[in-house]
């Protein structure tokens, strides 16, 4: 798809919520996004996921050395990478920022974690419902006297994390070009 980001290549390591949302927005504006997913992952989805539109996909089992080599080759020619694994996973796979930025110093390495890279919740899974509940925003939904009615991924995953990830990626990509 043609757009303002045409000519940029982004690697998206498949995840849920904010990472795919950010990659979708970049792809919708013309970036060439390559979604890397586990073999068989599409079969588990049971149909089309609208967050996966506008991009190609590649199945790689990153626990295999050959697949890690393929991803490193892709990253050498990419402008950006989006990953949403828990802290330390990419490093254990040999694909952390220290490795990929040595291979490609101009690579914008976008990390999306629920609770950051360190701190008391860093290793906990992060999901939209957790963020809006912990922040108090869930209290604002629903009717007085009833249980809260959670929004579907709109507040934390999309409006917060995914939007900020896409914006941060764009800012860093502009910075690299200057």
Task: For the regions a language model picked out, list residue spans one by one.
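Conserved N-terminal glycine-rich FAD pyrophosphate-binding loop of Rossmann-like flavoproteins
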Residues: 41-53
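Conserved small-residue-rich beta-alpha loop and adjacent elements
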Residues: 2-41
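A short, aliphatic-rich alpha-helical micro-motif
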Residues: 5, 72-76, 124
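A structured beta-alpha segment of the ubiquitous adenosine-cofactor-binding alpha/beta core
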Residues: 11, 51-102
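Hydrophobic/aromatic beta-strand patches that form the interior of the parallel beta-sheet core
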Residues: 11, 34, 58, 108-110
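Active-site-adjacent "lid/gating" segments in soluble enzymes
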Residues: 25, 29, 93-178
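Short secondary-structure boundary/capping segments
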Residues: 2, 48-50, 122-123
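Short glycine-/small-residue-rich Rossmann-like dinucleotide-binding loops
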Residues: 15, 62, 86-87, 113-114, ...
């Amino acid at each position: 798809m043609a757009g303002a980001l045409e000519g940029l290549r982004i690697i998206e390591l498949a995840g849920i919520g904010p990472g795919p949302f950010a990659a979708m927005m970049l792809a919708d504006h013309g970036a060439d996004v390559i979604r890397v997913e586990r073999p068989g992952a599409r079969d588990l989805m049971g149909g089309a996921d609208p967050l996966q539109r506008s991009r190609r996909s590649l199945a790689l089992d990153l626990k295999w050395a050959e697949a890690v080599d393929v991803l490193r080759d892709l990253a050498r020619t990419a402008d950006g990478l989006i990953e949403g694994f828990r802290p330390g996973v990419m490093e254990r796979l040999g694909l952390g920022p220290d490795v990929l930025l040595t291979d490609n110093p101009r690579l914008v390495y976008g990390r999306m974690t629920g609770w950051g890279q360190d701190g008391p919740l860093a290793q906990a899974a992060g999901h939209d419902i957790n963020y809006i509940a912990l922040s108090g925003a869930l209290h604002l939904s629903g009717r007085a006297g009833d249980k809260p009615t959670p929004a579907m991924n709109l507040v934390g995953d999309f409006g917060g994390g995914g939007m900020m990830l896409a914006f941060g990626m764009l800012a860093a990509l502009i910075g690299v070009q200057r």
